[in-house]
Amino acid sequence: MKGQETRGFQSEVKQLLHLMIHSLYSNKEIFLRELISNASDAADKLRFRALSNPDLYEGDGELRVRVSFDKDKRTLTIADNGVGMNRDDVIDHLGTIAKSGTKSFLESMGSDQAKDSQLIGQFGVGFYSAFIVADKVTVRTRAAGDKPENGVFWESAGEGEYTVADITKDDRGTEITLHLREGEDEFLDDWRVRSIISKYSDHIALPVEIEKQEEKDGETIVSWEKINKAQALWTRNKSEIKDDEYNEFYKHIAHDFTDPLTWSHNRVEGKQEYTSLLYIPSQAPWDMWNRDHKHGLKLYVQRVFIMDDAEQFMPNYLRFVRGLIDSNDLPLNVSREILQDSTVTRNLRSALTKRVLQMLEKLAKDDAEKYQTFWKQFGLVLKEGPAEDHANQEAIAKLMRFASTHTDSSAQTVSLEDYISRMKEGQEKIYYITADSYAAAKSSPHLELLRKKGIEVLLLSDRIDEWMMNYLTEFDGKAFQSVSKVDESLEKLADEVDESAKEAEKALTPFVERVKTLLGDRVKEVRLTHRLTDTPAIVTTDADEMSTQMAKLFAAAGQAVPEVKYIFELNPDHVLVKRTADTQDEAQFNEWVELLLDQALFAERGTLEDPNQFIRRMNQLLVS
């Protein structure tokens, strides 16, 4: 053939093919869904391009996909008359995986086949799924608008290389022929192929036709029978659509293997006219944290496909939402640039955001177990919301779940409404603590007085929490208060001190002054506290001072960290504090004070500047 050359697959393709064939074999019929889905995309792209260049239809505007098989040759063919591909397209799309993050995705794969199957499904195997059932795949294609002699031939056994050549192809579009492996004869059975298409492709707008052969007067007459509804699912009446159809449509647009957690299908008429179909997946996509990858909805205008990943209609903290919007108010020649500055877009974004938040609120109310699945998968992303979307901050906060001292479990199941319903009489604030881990938060000495008083504290240990709490300052009229910061309400919780105790504390004034003199400007202040029950000392920060956790975030990001000046608070009732106060030997007094400060800093920060000095001091005092 003219222009024939043999090329090697991109290394990631070889790895993906191997993993896919082994991981997806138990669900091998999905290859037909994937190939028909690709054909549907090709038809959508042709319709869109033909808006500005109708000649691309080449006199054939009836778009469809045709499925046929040859039992003698053991081949199954899927052919469309969509946009087609030129030689460069073929090499780009069939010889490489044009997705950012491919390498990291493949590195996340393990030996757990069930997990691998889900991951590959999320990745969107598309064309490569053909190799699950075929030991050779042949592609003949021509791009719409190109001359017949500009057709392209592609063939591979999926083992490391492929052949590409120039051919003549009269009709535009793509024809994929699968040479089936031994033992895959079920895909040569008319009834079996029909049932798979009905199961997976009934909802797509593109007609799917299957070849019919009849013998008449000694002649074989070939005709084509449409076997799907070929009506865009979102245009149908909700009452006519079964849950199975919604689930399959989700898998079609999201390239996912699992059913979604929930969805919302709405048609809005009035000032703005649009239809939206929004899904919440049951598992996080593999690339959710990849900032380079576009996340967004499919955009249709008057049922004409315009673009994938239209991120303008959903805020970033809802980037896990899948689905589509079909607008009657945008122009057919809309571009991403026009969308960016469009009043229609801003109004749609606002409406769709509220729709998703309402959908999640309903899920939380109706099915706590499903909502817990959602929170485990997407809670960290939703926590970006208070900073990004002040207008919906209360609604977002309502959806959040936390660990707390009430449940004594690391599971994040407590809502802010739950917390407020359990607030003590006279309690005005929502108390929380941020730490590196649940265990560190739970055992923090800052909680001692609150535990004693039976006051619930939210235990925040996700990296994003400290940053989030800078924006989430109140809920339902109740202010949030970090228990590691100085606050009058926390001091008020302490038990009333009787006269004899006051006298004893007064007697400790010279001790406090000695500590201040020793530590100098290493601390902001030294004082006695009644917030502690079991711990001799803690460090706290002023309300306007950078918190310990925020300083850690700055450091982790490589940014300059301003020095945090702590307030050193001593428990006058603790035996170690009393012993230190009674110590007259200046050197030993200094050692005790340094030890108490190191303990407090270690409990607060989880690290010490000089751990060896701390150990030396500890050992020395233990034997003294």
Curated annotation (Swiss-Prot):
Where is the region C?
553-624
Cellular component aspect of the GO annotation: cytoplasm
Region entry A, spans: 1-336
Question: What's the domain of life for this entry?
Answer: Bacteria
Q: Where does the record place it?
A: Cytoplasm
Pfam families recorded for this chain?
A: HATPase_c_3, HSP90
- Has keyword Cytoplasm? yes
> Which InterPro entries does the record associate with it?
HATPase_C_sf, Heat_shock_protein_90_CS, HSP90_C, Hsp90_fam, Hsp90_N, Ribosomal_Su5_D2-typ_SF
Chief localisation class? cytoplasm
Positions of the UniProt region annotated as B: 337-552
* Keywords assigned: ATP-binding, Chaperone, Cytoplasm, Nucleotide-binding, Stress response
Gene Ontology molecular function: ATP binding; ATP hydrolysis activity; ATP-dependent protein folding chaperone; unfolded protein binding
Question: Does Transmembrane helix appear among the keywords?
Answer: no
Q: How does it assemble?
A: Homodimer.
- Protein purpose: Molecular chaperone. Has ATPase activity.
Protein family per UniProt? Belongs to the heat shock protein 90 family.
- The entry's protein name is Chaperone protein HtpG
